[in-house]
């Protein structure tokens, strides 16, 4: 005997399932009944197809304009043209006073700039990149590979002051030795302990050219003294994740299909524009099929040859021209059809915009930035869009670019202290090895926030500072500047103007006040109109 049970409003679904979360059930009408993805850990979902997924992302970045633009946006908005060090050792924890800390910071920043931005690229083992270029490459690498890798090296043959160098390592070179399968403690080229912490990395030689034997080198994560040996930065999504997932995974299929759609649309437009007119001839079905598919006997072949010869002789004597005002008579039975231009869009632009909005959401950038189309934006929507993207880029700067930069900076600072290029304050209660994080604490200033309306941006900064809600340091950092450099330059300029007998630039303040007044009046007029 079947035990009766309560059912939902549809008369089929059990009430228990209907009252619970619908995402785990069959869905309204059973749409979700065939959707049964396996429950997997991050590594189980990522690593089996890891190389293929990254290869597809590489192909997109190399051959797809929107993908290349997405990576370029990460580089320009996270790093910019100069990744500036703002050194801030934790002076309270280290037991030194603030004045000694600031003096030490100035010495360190001066020495670091000399080392990091050397035009001869002494910081790079390949002698191709400055420090800012390495950070830009790391951010790009993280965007389409989901992680970045840098090896700290020591140049024992150099005659330069600093021997510390760094080598950018492509994530595709980190793999299990001899391409063996993953094990509990070695996954995708990363040797881990039982807690999941990385102990070292297996890095293969460059695979080009392909006939060379492939060798793997094991590089520990840290040296016995605590100095970083291999820098591996990525943002894990859950526990147990060994390698990073690239940002294109969620939109890879759409980007590839959009690429195919664009090529097909372009081919269609070319075909439609290729023929200005066509000539039709009256042939019976059997003759036309023989001409198109080919003739088997010699009699049919001679008919085809004769017909083509007659047409060639006729049109050579009376060619069809569309550039003139006169069209001659055609061969009897032929007709001339002019091909009118057709709309090649046919709703394509709207569909492309929809796809690009989906792709932009998956990549963390705005549609306007990805498509480079700002034609349909007002100031308010542009500001909201820029702020959304800015929050995303600041997170990436903090957890990707700054982590790479801080670890590289720590390697150099250790050598600079050992070589006495900079001297630790005498009253510090911890040595560098005892408090690496405190001595290496630093902020990194990259590109500034995009200014939609320069006047309103400055007004906002002034009002925040005057209200005590912000500082010159924060507001200058938003613009990609160091407030200490700004202040020092202002002092120098004031002294030079005074020495040259020039009056203070009072016109600047007057112009600013006039601009504020005009902006307020425009806002009031707009409010009245609304």
UniProtKB/Swiss-Prot annotation:
It is found in: Virion. InterPro entries: Phage_lambda_portal. GO terms for molecular function: DNA binding; structural molecule activity. It comes from the Viruses. Pfam families: Phage_portal_2. The keyword Lipoprotein does not apply. Keywords: Capsid protein, DNA-binding, Viral capsid assembly, Viral genome ejection through host cell envelope, Viral genome packaging, Viral long flexible tail ejection system, Viral penetration into host cytoplasm, Viral release from host cell, Virion, Virus entry into host cell. GO terms for biological process: symbiont genome ejection through host cell envelope, long flexible tail mechanism; virion assembly. GO terms for cellular component: viral portal complex. Proteolytically cleaved by the viral protease during capsid maturation. The record marks 19-20 as: Cleavage. Homododecamer. Interacts with the terminase complex composed of two small and one large terminase subunits. Forms the portal vertex of the capsid. This portal plays critical roles in head assembly, genome packaging, neck/tail attachment, and genome ejection. The portal protein multimerizes as a single ring-shaped homododecamer arranged around a central channel. Binds to the terminase subunits to form the packaging machine. Belongs to the siphoviridae portal protein family. This is Portal protein. The gene is gene 4.
């Amino acid at each position: 005997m079947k035990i009766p049970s309560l059912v939902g409003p549809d008369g089929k679904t059990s009430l228990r399932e209907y009252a619970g979360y619908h995402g785990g059930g069959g869905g309204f009408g059973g749409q979700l009944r065939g959707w049964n993805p396996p429950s997997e850990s991050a590594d189980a979902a990522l690593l089996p197809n890891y190389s293929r997924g990254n290869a597809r992302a590489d192909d997109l970045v190399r051959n797809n304009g929107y993908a290349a633009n997405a990576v370029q946006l990460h580089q320009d908005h996270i790093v910019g043209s100069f990744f500036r060090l703002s050194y801030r050792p934790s002076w309270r924890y280290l037991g030194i006073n603030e004045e000694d800390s600031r003096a030490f910071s100035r010495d360190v920043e001066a020495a670091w700039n000399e080392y990091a931005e050397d035009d001869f690229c002494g910081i790079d083992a390949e002698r191709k990149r400055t420090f800012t270029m390495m950070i830009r490459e790391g951010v790009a690498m993280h965007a389409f590979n989901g992680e970045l890798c840098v090896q700290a090296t020591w140049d024992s043959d150099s005659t330069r002051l600093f021997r510390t160098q760094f080598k950018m390592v492509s994530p595709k070179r980190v793999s299990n030795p001899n391409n063996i399968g993953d094990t509990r403690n070695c996954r995708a080229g990363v040797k881990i302990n039982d807690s999941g912490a990385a102990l070292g990395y297996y890095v293969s030689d460059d695979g080009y050219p392909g006939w060379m034997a492939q060798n793997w080198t094991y590089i520990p994560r840290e040296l016995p003294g605590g100095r970083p040996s291999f820098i591996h930065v990525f943002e894990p999504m859950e526990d147990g994740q060994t390698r990073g997932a690239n940002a294109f995974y969620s939109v890879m299929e759409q980007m590839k299909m959009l690429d195919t759609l664009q090529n097909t649309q372009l081919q269609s437009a070319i075909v439609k524009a290729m023929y200005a007119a066509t000539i039709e001839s009256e042939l019976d079905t059997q003759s036309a099929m023989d001409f198109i598919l080919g003739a088997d006997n010699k009699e049919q072949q001679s008919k085809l040859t004769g017909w083509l010869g007659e047409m060639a002789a006729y049109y050579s004597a009376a060619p069809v021209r569309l550039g003139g005002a006169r069209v001659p008579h055609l061969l009897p039975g032929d007709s001339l059809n002019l091909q009118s231009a057709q709309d090649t869009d046919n709703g394509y632009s709207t569909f492309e915009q929809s796809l690009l909005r989906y792709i932009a959401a998956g990549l963390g950038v705005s549609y306007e930035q990805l498509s480079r189309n700002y034609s349909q934006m007002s100031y308010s929507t542009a500001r909201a869009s820029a702020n959304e993207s800015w929050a995303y880029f600041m997170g990436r700067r903090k957890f990707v670019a700054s982590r790479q930069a801080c670890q590289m900076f720590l390697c150099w600072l250790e050598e600079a202290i050992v070589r006495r290029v900079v001297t630790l304050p005498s009253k510090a209660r911890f040595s560098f090895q005892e408090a690496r994080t405190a001595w290496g604490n630093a902020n990194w200033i990259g590109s500034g926030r995009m200014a939609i309306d320069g006047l309103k941006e400055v007004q906002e900064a002034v009002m925040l500072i005057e209200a005590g809600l912000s500082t010159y340091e924060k507001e200058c950092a938003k613009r990609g500047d160091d407030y200490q450099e700004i202040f020092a330059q202002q002092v120098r300029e004031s002294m030079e103007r005074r020495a040259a007998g020039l009056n203070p630039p009072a016109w600047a303040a007057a112009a600013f006040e006039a601009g504020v007044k005009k902006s307020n009046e425009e806002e009031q007029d707009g409010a009245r109109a609304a």
